[in-house]
From Swiss-Prot:
SUPFAM superfamilies: Tetrapyrrole methylase. It comes from the Eukaryota. The modification N-methylvaline is found at V395. The modification N-methyltyrosine is found at Y393. The modification N-methylisoleucine is found at I391, I392, I394. It comes from Mycena rosella. This is Methyltransferase/ribosomally synthesized type I borosin cyclic peptide precursor mroMa1. Residues 1-246 are annotated as: Methyltransferase domain. S-adenosyl-L-methionine binds at Y96, H98, V101, A128, Q170, G208, S239, T240. Pathway: Secondary metabolite biosynthesis. One of its GO terms (biological process) is methylation.
């Protein structure tokens, strides 16, 4: 048997809820990896990774740009991880949620690493779907469940099955392949829902809570209401739709008898499918993206983590200590004022008990940091919770 080359790649997920969804296995790897690459959406998780890493760390979202195709960014994310693997380092890549669900760079990097003879594996993480099963309280094995990305659903003209659970991801970025999210094509998804389920069927709009200050979104709408402007503006890049069964499929008595099952059986079978890749790893588009890496200059307009050590430590404690979180929620202003080492802006943001202000005080532009500029209380209070997070992956197109 041929020996594996020095260097390895492990891909892990940070889950959805800040810090608390990171598994003990992933934490152990964070502490041992030679180099960590991460793409996470909240600053508390970013701080936690940096604090616990022994080696270098790099934020993969640096490769995003509003004037750049996301696929190009994904190729570059994969390639920078692979370069360190090829250099003999033990590399850990961390992605928001489950690292294999709606994440293109992770699959690409693992496939190429294995093909080149390196050890490469993926560890599971908590996805938005896992979070949804817990928060909305339905079992996908009852009646069956179909999960699809909104744009993929439309471009392949797939029908939604009214007899099963349907989960539709990325409803806030229909038809978008850049980092500009206007959702101008959302009406096309509504048309499909109207056609397959009717105007009166109810769906649930879901966003799992991320920061300790976040509140899980579980709003119910009739399909006819999805065209209303005041409803449409509630959907963001982190939004997922749950469409419950309209009419469950009837039980087939002959099948029940042939299988020797009780007459009261109600559950259907699950189908399992594998993943196939039919595209070359390094075609013309991929080679252009790789070539651009050597001249890539990170944008100075990308906010970076900038928070006091006290704030970083407190956000970890709020994520991992339920009793402390309850104490904070009971009186956030009084709680914040008793914490030593926090800046005035951090105390103010904590007192608002909302995720948006936390993002504002924990991430700043490099130019603002260099000049000593701090966000005003007005800017902190104005922070929009709905747009505080940017979902950073989409299914391969």
């Amino acid at each position: 048997m041929a020996l594996k080359k020095p260097g390895s790649l492990t891909i892990a997920g940070s889950g959805i809820a800040s810090i608390g969804h990171i598994t003990l296995e992933t934490l152990a790897l964070i502490k041992e990896a030679d180099k960590i690459f991460y793409a996470v959406t909240d600053p508390a998780t970013e701080c936690y990774i940096q604090e616990n890493s022994r080696g270098d760390h790099f934020d993969l979202t640096t490769f995003y740009d509003t004037n750049k195709k996301r696929y190009e960014s994904y190729v570059q994310m994969s390639e920078v991880m692979l370069r360190d693997v090829r250099a003999g380092r033990n590399v850990l890549g961390i992605f928001y949620g489950h690292p294999g669900v709606f994440v293109a760079p992770s699959h690409r990097a693992i496939a190429i690493a294995r093909e080149e003879g390196f050890q490469a594996k993926m560890l599971p993480g908590i996805s938005a779907e896992d979070y949804m099963f817990a928060d909305l309280g339905f079992d996908p094995s009852t009646y069956g469940c179909m999960t699809q990305e909104a744009t993929e659903l439309l471009v392949r003209n797939k029908k939604l099955d009214p007899s099963i659970h349907n989960i539709i991801w990325q409803v806030g970025s229909v038809g978008v392949d850049t980092m500009v999210f206007d959702n101008g094509k959302f009406h096309l998804l509504v048309e499909r829902l109207e056609k397959d389920f009717g105007l009166d069927h109810k769906i649930q709009h879901y966003i799992g809570a991320i920061l300790p200050q976040s509140v899980t979104v579980k709003d119910t709408f009739a399909i006819r209401d999805l065209r209303k402007e005041e409803v449409l503006k509630q959907f963001t890049t982190t939004s997922t739709f749950y469409v419950p069964p309209r009419t469950p499929a009837p039980i087939d008595p002959k099948a029940v008898q042939a299988l020797g099952l009780p007459a009261t059986v109600t559950k259907g079978a699950q189908d399992w499918t594998g993943f196939q890749s039919v595209s070359p790893a390094y075609g013309p588009d991929e080679m252009r993206a790789v070539a651009a890496l050597d001249s890539f200059v990170p944008s100075q307009e990308k906010a970076v983590v900038h928070a006091s050590r006290a704030m970083q430590s407190l956000m970890v404690d709020l994520a991992l200590r339920p009793a402390l979180l309850e104490q904070y929620k009971a009186d956030p202003v009084a709680f914040a004022n008793t914490r030593n080492g926090l800046t005035a802006q951090e105390k103010f943001a904590l007192g608002l008990k909302k995720p948006g202000p936390i993002f504002v005080v924990m991430r700043q532009l490099p130019s603002a940091i260099a000049s000593g500029q701090e966000p005003s209380q007005e800017e902190i209070a104005r922070a929009d919770d709905a747009t505080a997070f940017i979902i950073i992956y989409i299914v391969q197109g």
